[in-house]
Design a protein with these regions (language model features):
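Interface amphipathic segments
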Residues: 1-186
Length: 186
């Protein structure tokens, strides 16, 4: 039971230290190692809501499965690369193992309502993907006004030059609004 935590010091992860004021509503049912949780979190970095089942939570390879919603979450601040990444709003089903390292794996099936990338905010993206430390396998369908495409395949980033096996159908890609080409240089 959760009473096992009574009197134990809690170490705050670096990420939470930069989150500013954190408002957290958390319901947990189960043991430390296997529990159901409902979470609503609001921070200066954005908002998170989740309904998850955690297994092996105290082990080296925690497993999780459930539903996740991100609202206006600042990926740039979290990753330390605000020049490339902006904010994300997304909702979907999630299943995974670990939170980093060589055994990390996450599967996501849902919708990215907005994603800031390279100074442009993409909208209306459907994503079904399996992702590991160096591998992406999945399907991305973008219905953004400036980027309409379907990607289905695999990219392995573990080598010096990524190994790619995919099919892409590109309907529209407006390079200037997307910030891929600056000004009228074409």
């Amino acid at each position: 039971p959760i009473t096992e935590l009574a009197g134990e010091p809690v170490e705050i992860p670096e990420l939470l230290k930069s989150a500013g004021i954190v408002r957290l509503q958390l319901n947990v049912n189960g043991s430390l190692n296997d529990f159901q949780t409902e979470l609503n979190g609001q921070t200066d970095l954005g908002n998170v809501a989740a309904k998850l089942h955690m297994k092996n939570a105290t082990g080296s390879k925690p497993e999780y499965e459930g539903w996740l919603e991100l609202h206006n979450l600042n990926l740039g601040a979290i990753s330390g690369d605000s020049s490339l990444l902006g904010r994300i709003s997304a909702v979907g089903e999630i299943r995974g193992q670990g939170f980093g390292g060589p055994d990390f794996f996450v599967a996501f099936d849902g919708k990215i309502n907005r994603l800031g990338l390279n100074s442009y905010t993409y909208t209306n993206i459907e994503l079904t993907a399996d992702m590991g430390p160096s591998i992406f396998t999945g399907r991305i369908q973008s219905n953004d006004p400036h980027a309409q495409f379907l990607f289905n395949g695999r990219i392995d980033f573990s080598k010096e030059h990524p190994d790619m096996d995919f099919i892409a159908n590109l309907s529209r890609l407006d390079l200037i609004p997307l910030g891929i080409i600056l000004g009228d240089s074409i």
